[in-house]
From Swiss-Prot:
Co-factor(s): Mg(2+)
Protein name: Anthranilate synthase component 1
Catalytic reaction equation(s): chorismate + L-glutamine = anthranilate + pyruvate + L-glutamate + H(+)
Disulfide bridge map: none
Function: Part of a heterotetrameric complex that catalyzes the two-step biosynthesis of anthranilate, an intermediate in the biosynthesis of L-tryptophan. In the first step, the glutamine-binding beta subunit (TrpG) of anthranilate synthase (AS) provides the glutamine amidotransferase activity which generates ammonia as a substrate that, along with chorismate, is used in the second step, catalyzed by the large alpha subunit of AS (TrpE) to produce anthranilate. In the absence of TrpG, TrpE can synthesize anthranilate directly from chorismate and high concentrations of ammonia.
Domain of life: Bacteria
Pathway(s): Amino-acid biosynthesis; L-tryptophan biosynthesis; L-tryptophan from chorismate: step 1/5
Cross-referenced Pfam families: Anth_synt_I_N (PF04715), Chorismate_bind (PF00425)
SUPFAM superfamilies membership: ADC synthase (SSF56322)
Protein residues bound to L-tryptophan: S38, P283, Y284, M285
Cofactor note: Binds 1 Mg(2+) ion per subunit.
Length: 518
């Protein structure tokens, strides 16, 4: 067996339905598998799909400790290499712990050794390099910030996602829907075995005829009604909003984004994902299977909002704040009523509260990027545009900047988290107040899901329009942006509008009708 990892790639047959192909190749039953997809929000056509079919290492961060669990022979070699690289932080087998920084200077705190260092070493120093690999896929929890900032202690929630969890890909399927091309890539210390495994997968892909691509068998739900329960009833949520508005009146904050959780039975998370991608195609769609503290989970969603995107080739950072929401104009049968839709758009565009909230968050995005960008490189590339989805429309903007040459994408993520559209402003004070009223971790909700490539690229989305599924129960979280002029009941209604696409997908997958108790 070779001591140096070997990368092998293979062009394979293109399939339009990447999610069905992912299921055909065993992705819905394999541990540590993941699928990321992207669709054009205007045409709804697929852009790209990226699947991890086999992982070599699972990387889990809890507090200041990171556990790197090798899953294959090549993974064991990678972790051994990592242990040599980060030996001073190696506190137990496959485990690394990092002390909290006591630096006062902001740049010193940002660049001090931290749990981010494990991801950085795996991204840039895994011992192999190819156009497709290394590839890390996974996500950061909203609560990851607590490992760098002091926040009020709160309890665990039904969303038990760790501070971060990624997998280091061993076999990847990369599909370009625009060019109608597909490629398998893999890495292994045993080149012959790897080549044979990829050839076997290639034959399975050839055998996945279009007529059989949709043969995924769903798990039925026992009952005609899917009962959805809000953890915080409307009356209590209105009270929380009024409490938070007092902090706005007092000048503590300008805006804040409280959230609540809708829970529902979800016997088949992948079937729900298929329904969500069909009814609500989005720029960032994801289905992830993971394991944390011995318990398996699934995380799926169709997010409209980029978190932080970094393109290494031109060192451009991009934030995509979304704030301002209206329901789509629908006829009773669910079809689009163009006149009502335009009326709702006009109402949103002329709503002083929505414009104030959105403008505030664009300024916040500019301030976030200022911390890590080349001076005078920031610009608002798009302002107050409208993106339409199946159930809602949003006001959106795009802010760009050039990353400081001394920093990388992980530094930028750490400096910018969490996005203001999920916290409020000022961000740290808003998050302190949110913990005071919510009293639970948010888990994956409001965090990020995406990938890191060995060339330095990073792309991830904010985890919204999503469900965290564990033990057959889905937690669907949604928030509302609260400013001085907010109407508490309108904000409570907005959380359901935002959650509805996911809840409806779960109901469709179960062949049931929704009943929401709020």
């Amino acid at each position: 067996m070779s001591t140096n990892p070997h990368v092998f790639s293979l062009d394979v047959r293109y399939h339009e339905d990447a999610s069905a192909l992912f299921a055909h190749l065993g992705g819905t039953t394999a541990d540590d598998a993941a699928l990321l997809e992207s669709a054009d929000i205007t045409t709804k056509n697929g852009i790209s799909s990226l699947a991890v079919l086999k992982s070599s290492v699972r990387i889990t961060c809890t507090g200041n400790t990171v556990v790197t669990q090798p899953l294959t022979d090549s993974g064991r070699a990678v972790v051994a290499r990592l242990t040599q690289q980060l030996g001073q932080y190696n506190t137990a087998e496959n485990t690394f712990s990092f002390p909290a920084s006591d630096a006062v200077d902001e740049r010193e705190r940002l660049t001090a050794p931290s749990t981010i260092e494990v991801l950085r070493k795996l991204q840039f120093e895994s011992g192999y390099s190819d156009a497709s690999l290394p590839l890390l896929m996974g996500g950061f929890a909203f609560d990851f910030l607590e490992t760098f900032e002091t926040l009020p202690a709160v309890e665990e929630s039904v969303n038990t996602y760790p501070d971060y969890q990624f997998v280091l890909a061993e076999i990847v399927l990369d599909i370009n829907h625009q060019d109608q091309t597909a490629k398998l890539a893999g890495v292994s210390n045993a080149p012959g075995e790897l080549e044979a495994e990829l050839n076997k997968l290639s034959l399975l892909i050839d055998a996945a005829l279009p007529a059989t691509e949709h043969a995924y068998q769903t798990t039925p739900h026992d009952g005609d009604t899917l009962r959805v329960v809000a953890d915080i009833p409307d009356a209590q949520f209105r009270t929380q909003i009024n409490e938070l508005k007092e902090n706005i009146y007092n000048g503590d904050i300008y805006q804040v984004v409280p959230a609540r959780t809708f829970t529902a039975p979800c016997p088949d998370a992948f079937a729900a994902y298929l329904q969500l991608r069909a009814t609500n195609p989005s720029p960032y769609m994801f289905y992830i299977r993971g394991l944390n503290e011995g318990r398996s989970y699934e995380l799926f969603g169709a997010s409209p909002e980029s978190n932080l995107k970094f393109t290494a080739a031109n060192r451009e950072l991009q934030l995509y704040p979304i704030a301002g929401t209206r329901p789509r104009g629908l006829n009773p049968d669910g079809s689009i009523n163009d006149e009502l839709d335009i009326r709702n758009e006009l109402d949103m565009r002329t709503d002083a509260k929505e414009i104030a909230e959105h403008t505030m968050l664009v300024d916040l995005a500019r301030n976030d990027l200022a911390r890590v960008s080349v001076p005078a490189s920031r610009r608002v590339a798009d302002l107050l545009q409208v993106d339409r989805y199946s159930r809602v429309m949003h006001l959106v903007s795009r802010v760009t900047a050039t990353l400081d040459p001394e920093l990388d994408a992980l530094d930028a993520y750490r400096a910018c988290m969490n996005m203001g559209t999920l916290t409020g402003a000022p961000k740290l004070r808003a998050m302190e107040l949110l913990r005071g009223v919510e009293k639970r971790r948010r888990g994956s909700y409001g965090g990020a899901v995406g990938y890191l490539r060995g060339n330095g690229d990073m792309d991830n989305c904010i985890v919204i329009r999503s469900a965290f599924v564990q033990d057959g129960v889905a937690a669907v979280q949604a928030g509302a942006g609260v400013v001085r002029d907010s109407n508490p009941q309108s904000e409570a209604d907005e959380t359901l509008h935002k959650a509805y696409a996911v809840l409806n997908a779960i109901a469709l997958a179960a062949g049931s009708t929704l009943e929401v108790i709020r």
